[in-house]
Structures are given as structure tokens and as C-alpha cells.
Amino acid sequence: MNPIVKSFEYGQHTVTLETGVIARQADGAVMASMGDTTVLVTVVGKKEADPGRDFFPLTVNYQEKTYAAGKIPGGFFKREGRPSEDETLIARLIDRPIRPLFPDDFTNEVQVIITVVSVDPQIEPDIVSMIGTSAALAISGIPFNGPLGAARVGYVNGEYVLNPGAAELAGSELDLVVAGTQSAVLMVESEAKSLPEEVMLGAVVYGHDQQQVVINAINEFAAEAGKPRWNWTAPVKNEALVAQIKELAEEGLTAAYQIMAKQERYEAVGEVKKATIAKLQEANPDVNVREAADLLGSLEKNVVRGRIIAGMPRIDGREPDMIRALSVMAGVLPRTHGSALFTRGETQALVTCTLGTERDAQKIDSIMGERTNRFMLHYNFPPYSVGETGMVGSPKRREIGHGKLAWRGINAVMPSAEEFPYSVRVVSEITESNGSSSMASVCGTSLALMDAGVPIKTSVAGIAMGLVKEGDNFVVLSDILGDEDHLGDMDFKVAGTRDGVTALQMDIKIEGITKEIMEIALQQAYGARVHILNVMDQAIGSARPDISDFAPRITTIKINPEKIRDVIGKGGAVIRALTEETGTTIELEDDGTVKIASNNGDATREAIRRIEEITSEVEVGRLYTGKVIRIVDFGAFVNILPGKDGLVHISQISDERVANVSDHLQLNQEVTVKVMEVDRQGRVRLSIKEAQVKEPAAE
């Protein structure tokens, strides 16, 4: 075994790429490390494509092994299970920038597996995983137009920071991941605290500039360790068939793409394609139907793009910067804690908000450590939203990714736990879809949160931008349709407030996207965002003053931290009795904060009264009403507060002489007593005869 190793400095860390020792039967295998965070990346591709396949079957599997953090998995089986949400998101993060770098007609199956084998809690594995994937593909010999670089950019004290650690990222106003080739940005994923557009654009440019060191290092690594390139050539295009299809279908496709309603348009396009294939088969029974279908798809793309570049109206008749018709409603469901229906053209989101207590928060135990998520946003994309049938069940990768993007867009305006001590779950049900459903979810979430009385800092809206570029000519499109996303060169989603950007996601399919184009897209997105916010604010412009009658009301009180154990009781007996008997939910924190949640105000007040009883101190000179719990020869013990008993000496029972305690007191008898003394050992001396005055007793 002769290892080939390449190391280079990248930001605050040393990155090392190594091959030739592990997983030598894979087409490409790289052990990539950044500090103590190490991943094994393997790439395997099939030498032959399956006959009849008309798509590129790329699979990216990202898996975090608990041994990487020195942990044993939980659960009965004690082994890793299905991918977590974090693993799914990182797999998508790696997939998105590498997919457009494979040749257009390449349909051989390729599988990339990234395994995290060691982790430093301060260094996230995502960036080194992207670097390792790029290196493994570069040395594999598989057709790949890389290498690819990747960088994380933070923004601390007005300065950009390259690959900040977890501690530094906690104080950053920006968490942006950018990936690209030597000449082009391909992918951006970010979350920000309402930063101006120019700061966001500057971060993208900064990250792309800094990652050139990665690209150069991978090129040097591949020159030394790379396998011979596969002998693969793109299939030769049948120009005669191209011309024939253009003659038969161009006019019909042009007419079909002037139909504004999505379903009617799809039917018309389908009829044109069906008629074209039939005419081709009539003229030549041996025509390759799959090839003809592919060429029809290319013609369809050219027709739509050509009209846009020529300055003609878009598919639905809009100008490039126009937004579709908006319909905004808040409070649409009677029993939910908050709800909204946001409709933009043929895209619609029904969004609900549910409030819960701290115990409803999501507890996440990952290899990076444990964390609690008080704000959850779940996105569902049922098949009926696009007029189709399909499987319904657990969320797919796309749904998890879209939900996280919407979460990033909203998270910057969420109140702190001190301002609003609730856990919040938002669910976005996409009931209609024709482009930009994730951004509709952002708008709907902002509305539903306000309807639920969540004091978010300000309204948030999202918009999806597109691009059509031919040579030096380009058109930036606002509020893209699904077809414009599919047929265009860029998907550029921006969420934010009037003051700045809270989330930015960008996927670019071509090279040559300049800083100028991104700047125009961001400014156009700002105008669209403000327009949407104005419409949203007409429906509901700020959080409702009170939460729903159906939501739990949380009341917070403070107790002496030393009294927490008294409230909990032995084996949790006291707090369990409190919650069951009052019908409330009670949560205790180490600093003595007690949160009582209930839909019933009387139940909350009763729980507070009982907690105050348990935690209160016995006051000398105060009267208490208690029960006799034990009788002895020299007196009786009386319980005056939960967990607090005192002795009434036989001489303090009555003004008269008492010979036998049982003649005057019985077990469980209620008596009023006065506290005479609490000694150094906490023992309480009580008197019944001194309490025989006209004063109200403490309950």
C-alpha cells in the first residue's frame, strides 16, 4: 500500500486528502480530514448505462457513525438506523453542486458514499465531506467536469470569516455555504440575521474566492493519484431527426406555451408530443421513440427560453419582474392555535402553528452533541398538489430540504425563550404547486405565527427567482413557475424582511453567472419581497395580543433553587401528584424557574398555590391550619405545610391542665396553631393555646 497524501491550509484548519490505503476496490476513495474531523468518501460508477434509461441515476449517501464521537447508539438494537434530518440535509448539500458537473447525456449509475469516521465538535463535517467528494470524483476516472470547491462563510463584527468553528458560528450573523468550480458559483445555502443584500452577495464572492485553494489542491492531488479517464463519449445527435421534429412540433409547442393554466397547458403539450411521435412512426416505423422524446424535450426548452430572451411575455403572460396574483388569509382553521392560507398564482400553502411547552421541544442527539430545538417547521408535499397520484408516508429528501429552507427564513425573527416560553411547531401543507412552494411556506409561516400570537420581530416573505441566459443575453425572472425552474438556468430563493435577507438558497445549472447577474437578481427579489410583505400586512401585520383559547397558557414563577427537591419529592411523587391533581404541566429549571402550563386558569392558580405552600418557609408568630399526624405522650405532631411538621407540647394544647393528649386531640384532626419557635436544627415548636385569638389562619 502506497498512500498518496495532499495537505493544505484552509482558513483556520489543515485539510488532508489521502488515497491508496482504504477502500481500494472503489473507483475513487479518499480519506479527507479537517482538523480531527475525518470522512471516508467512496465513488463507484457502472461502466455501462442500462438500456433505455433517459436520466442520470446519481445517489449520494451521507452517514454519521456514532463511534466517530465516541458514542454508542441508543435504542434496542444499538446500531445506526435510518438517516437523520441532519444527514439528509448534508446529503442534499453535496448532491446539488456535483450533479450539474456530470455530462448532460451521461446516464451511467454513480453512487457516492460519505462516512463520518471521526468528529471534532468544533468542526462540522459538511465542508470536508464536500471537499472529499470532489477529490474522490476527480481521481475516479468517471466523467466529471470538476473539481469542486466548498467553503463556509461567517460574518462576525462586520468581517467575513472563513470556515468558522462551532463556537465562532454561534456569534455569527451569517452561516453560508458556497460551492463552485474555478470559474463559477454553483450552489449557495445560507441562514442570516436580516443582513443587507450587498453583505450576502459579498459573502458568496468571498467564499468562492477563498475556495480556489481547494480546487488547486484537488487538481494537484488528481494529477498524482487519478485513474485514467473513462472512454466515454456523448451519443451523436441525429440532426436529421432534430430538423424533422422541429418542423413537426415547434409551432404546436409555441402555441401550447401560451396557455396560462398549468393543467390545460400540460395537456396541450402532451397532445403535441403524442401527435409528433405518431407522425414520426408513420414516416419511419423504426424511429427511436426514446431519442425522439429526448429531442422533443430539448425543443420544448428552446421554445420557452427563446420567447423569454426575445422579450416576449412569459408562459403565464407576465413580464419578467411581475409577481403572480396573491391571496392572503389568516385564522382560517377554528381549533388550531394559529393558521394561514397563502396563495400565489397556482401555488398554495395551508400553514398551521401549534404551541407547546418546553417538554414538546425537539431533543436532538447527534455526533456534534445534544441540542434542543424549540422551533420546528415541517413541510409536506402531497401528490394531489400537482394533480397526480403517488405514495403518501414519511417525508422525502426534498420535503426535508424545503422545510429546512423555510425554517432558516423564519428563525432569525423568532422570539427568545425568555420572551416567549413556548415550543412552536409549524406545518406547511402544500395544497397546490406550480413553483416556489418553499417560499410560499415562508410567507404562510409568518402569517400563522402572528395569528397564533407568537411575537416574531417582523413579517417575513420569500420569493423564487429564475434566469434564462443565452450567450451575453440574459433575463432575470421573478416568482418563477415550475416550468421556468425546470427549463431555466438558475433557481435563486430569497427570504427576508424589509430590513434584510434571512435565508438565501441558490442552485445554478450553467457557468458564467456573474456577480452582476446575482446583484440584479437580489435587487429584483427585494422589490418582490416588499410587494408581498405589503399584501401580507393587510391580512395581519403583527402578532395577535393574546394566544388562542385552545393553546396552553404558560405562567412562570421563581422559587428558591434549594426548594426544587421539595417540589419534585421522593421519586417524583410530589410533582406527579401536583400535575395529576391540578391537570397542569409543570417544568422546573435549575435556577428555580417554574413553568406551569394549562388551558384552565383556575388549574394554574391552584398549582401555583400548592407550589408556594411547598416552598414557603415557616414564619415565627404566624398562624397555620394543619392536621394532627402523630400523637405521643408529651404532645402531638401537626403538619402545617407540605413536608413541614411541628410539635405541640402537651403544655401548649390548652390553658387547662392536660393529663392525656388523646383526650383533647385525635389523628387527622384539623387544628389552628401558632409558630412559637424554629430552632437551629429546623425543628418547629407550635402552640394551640396561643392560637386561640381572633386572627385568620394561613391555609
UniProtKB/Swiss-Prot annotation:
Required co-factor(s) are: Mg(2+)
* Enzyme class (EC, first level): transferase
Where would I find the S1 motif domain in this sequence?
Answer: 621-689
**Positions bound to Mg(2+):** D485, D491
* Catalytic function, reaction form: RNA(n+1) + phosphate = RNA(n) + a ribonucleoside 5'-diphosphate
Pfam families, sorted: KH_1 (PF00013), PNPase (PF03726), RNase_PH (PF01138), RNase_PH_C (PF03725), S1 (PF00575)
- UniProt entry tagged with the keyword Metal-binding: yes
Q: Name one GO biological process term.
A: RNA processing
> What PANTHER family does the annotation carry?
POLYRIBONUCLEOTIDE NUCLEOTIDYLTRANSFERASE (PTHR11252), POLYRIBONUCLEOTIDE NUCLEOTIDYLTRANSFERASE 1, MITOCHONDRIAL (PTHR11252:SF0)
UniProt name for this protein: Polyribonucleotide nucleotidyltransferase
Highest classification ranks of the organism = Bacteria, Pseudomonadati, Pseudomonadota, Gammaproteobacteria, Alteromonadales
